[in-house]
Curated annotation (Swiss-Prot):
One Gene Ontology cellular component annotation held by this UniProt entry: cytoplasm
Oligomer and partners: Homodimer.
Membrane-spanning parts: none
NCBIfam families: PRK02304.1-5 (NF002636)
This protein's UniProt keywords: Cytoplasm, Glycosyltransferase, Purine salvage, Transferase
Name the record gives this protein: Adenine phosphoribosyltransferase
Domain of life: Bacteria
One GO process term, biological-process aspect: purine ribonucleoside salvage
CDD domains: PRTases_typeI (cd06223)
Species the sequence originates in: Borreliella afzelii (strain PKo)
Catalytic activity: AMP + diphosphate = 5-phospho-alpha-D-ribose 1-diphosphate + adenine
Cell compartments where the protein resides: Cytoplasm
Function: Catalyzes a salvage reaction resulting in the formation of AMP, that is energically less costly than de novo synthesis.
EC number of the protein: 2.4.2.7
Amino acid sequence: MKNKTEYYDQFIAKVPNFPKKGILFYDITSVLLKPEVYTSLINEVYSFYNLKKIDCIAVVESRGYLIGAPLSLKMQLPLVLIRKEGKLPREVFGEEYELEYGFGRIEVHKDDVRMYSNILLIDDILATGGTLKSSAILLERAGGRVKNIFCFIELCGINGRRILEGYKVNSLVRYD
């Protein structure tokens, strides 16, 4: 996937000391304010993944939904939601994860993932890789196969790709 940092950087707000001191938060919600930019993002991802063998798209709460939901419609694929603990009403698989700034637990409905389905996993940002690694483990435990991972932004200096070794990881925006 081509590096599009130069184009998208102007539309990504950088918020220092959020959610806690010492963290620089990359806010992609400003991309949503420009429909032409948001459309461009979805079209870029669609163009890259459209011809790959993908059976469903799984998205990480909550900003992963912003990319995955329109993409699943465009690709005519089922959308599987990965949520924070306690937000799903049916039987779930759960997995612990570590964030850049804390810990948490994610869940997926046990019956949302088809056995042996090829999954494109999407989140907005790749930092430590902890959330995505836990999401991939969760989906695989539910019977799926995570074939590809896409993140809009990748913080290369943190090197989250290291713990995602074995997965095909792509991003459009890369910051050192």
